[in-house]
Amino acid sequence: MRFIQLASAVMIASAFSATPALAQESATLKKIRDTGTITLGHRESSIPFSYYDDKQQVIGYSHELMLKAVEGIKNELKMSKIDTKLMPVTSANRITLVQNGTVDIECGSTTNNTERQKQVGFSTTIFVIGTKLMAKKDAGIKDFADLAGKNVVTTAGTTSERLLRKMNEEKKMGMSIISAKDHGESFLTLETGRAVAFMMDDALLYGEIAKAKKASDWIVVGTAQSKEAYGCMLRKDDPAFKKVVDTALTKAMTSGEADKIYAKWFMNPIPPKGLNLAMPLSDDMKALYKAPNDKAFE
């Protein structure tokens, strides 16, 4: 009888000790473990961060870092294999797809800011950029003041769209702002003469130049209107999942792996045209790799 009572006591104690762990378990990690699958959100034309190559394979700087995060998740769950499902997202739908559980993590060219933090979570920063303009070299566009009364394109649902509309209203510049569905469409609008300039993150603008029919026709100009931090989007209020992702990204940055990934996409020829963006690691990026963090600039 005493043995039965003792065994019962051990079982009850074990049950109580397990309860907090279950309560704190990451919903995302549980979903991945139970299904054996993780859904990765990616962009279709955010060169060189996340985009399709000419064989419709997803490639890019951010995509490679996301795969590092997947490896960290696999190790955390002690799984020999995790199936990855790739899902294309746009600037307009990416937040919703993370919120509703369709996408588990999205690493592309998404800015981490305080407004978005009310809707989703963000990983450690993966890139730091400035917002500028792309225009034809002979268009006479040197800075934002030159856009008064002209057609300007940007991509819908981006920080650049918000900044451009705010500038137009506050400075009464009389710009006609065109909001395209993605960066590829934005550049097409510029290329076909429907706009005189394309406002977007500087690295993305260089990416569009890399796939242009004649790259030498285009130039990136203007005073940066903001400094932004790109992060991988996660579901909000899942700190355990964020910790696993952050740990993997931090390891890549502090070990030198991220430097190699950066050099591959920003200092060497890249698909689809084989052009070199020739963007050396900035002081902001050097500081990030030395001391990874998830701070937003606004």
Residue ranges, per PLM feature:
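Periplasmic-binding protein-like
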Residues: 44, 127-138, 210-246, 268-293, ...
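A ligand-binding cleft/hinge motif common to bilobed small-molecule-binding domains
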Residues: 93, 107-118, 163-170, 184, ...
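Extracytoplasmic small-molecule ligand-binding "clamshell" domains
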Residues: 25, 31-105
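Immediate post-signal peptide segment of exported/extracytoplasmic ligand-binding proteins
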Residues: 23-55, 140-141, 145-150, 285-298
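Extended ligand-binding regions for polar small-molecule ligands
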Residues: 64-72, 145, 150-151, 156-158, ...
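Bilobed "Venus flytrap"/periplasmic-binding protein-like clamshell domains
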Residues: 39, 45-48, 58-75, 111, ...
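Acidic, polar ligand-binding/catalytic clefts
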Residues: 67, 79-146, 286-296
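Short helix-initiation/N-cap motifs at beta->coil->alpha
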Residues: 25, 79-96, 139, 177-188, ...
